[in-house]
Amino acid sequence: MTREDSIRQIENYPPFNEQEEKDKALILGWISNNENAFSRENTVAHITASAWVVNKDRSKVLMVYHNIYNSWSWLGGHADGETDLLSVAIREVKEEAGISNVRPVSEEIFSLESLTVDGHVKKGNYVSSHLHLNITYLLEADSEEQVSVKADENSCLLYTSDAADD
C-alpha cells in the first residue's frame, strides 16, 4: 500500500464520533504537511498502527500491559516509514505477542485516534512528549496459541472478555 493509498483509506474512513472526526482531520493534515509523518524521526507526531485482536468467536480481546505507559492497551507500534499500515499492525502483533496466526477481520480501518505520549526513557535515551497518530485495524487470532511477553515493551499479555476486571 502506498502513501497515497493510506491517505485514501483514512479519507474514506467514516468517523464513529466527534473525537474520530477531529482526529481524522488532524491525521490527514499532518500527513499532507509532513513528508516524514510515517517516521518517528518526526519527533512532534508520527503515524502508528495498532490492532484490536479478538479471538475466533469474538468473545475475548488480547490486551497487553505496556511498560512505558504502565497501563493496559491494545497492541501496536511505529510505522517506521512503512505506509502499509495494516501490515504494520500485523507485524506489531506478531512481535509484541509472539504469535504467528493472526489475520485481518477486515482490511478497513477499525478506529483512529490521536494518542499523547509523555516523555520517557527508552533504551537509555530520553524521548520527548509527542503524539501518536494511530490507525487501528480489527484482527483475529487463535486464543489457544501461546502468547509471549516482549520484555522490552510489555510485561503481561492476556485474552480477556472484560479488561477492566483484570
Label each region the model flagged.
Residues 1-23:
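Predominantly extracellular/luminal regions of secreted and cell-surface proteins
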Residues 15-50:
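Acidic, metal-coordinating catalytic segment for phosphate/diphosphate chemistry
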Residues 39-71:
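A glycine-rich, hydrophobic loop/mini-helix early in the fold
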Residues 53, 138-140, 158:
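Short, well-ordered beta-strand micro-motif
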Residues 59-100:
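Conserved Nudix-box catalytic region and its N-terminal flanking loop in Nudix hydrolases
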Residues 98-145:
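Active-site segment of metal-dependent pyrophosphate-handling enzymes
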Residues 137, 159-166:
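Conserved small/polar residues in nucleotide/adenosyl-binding loops
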Residues 145-161:
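C-terminal/domain-terminus segments
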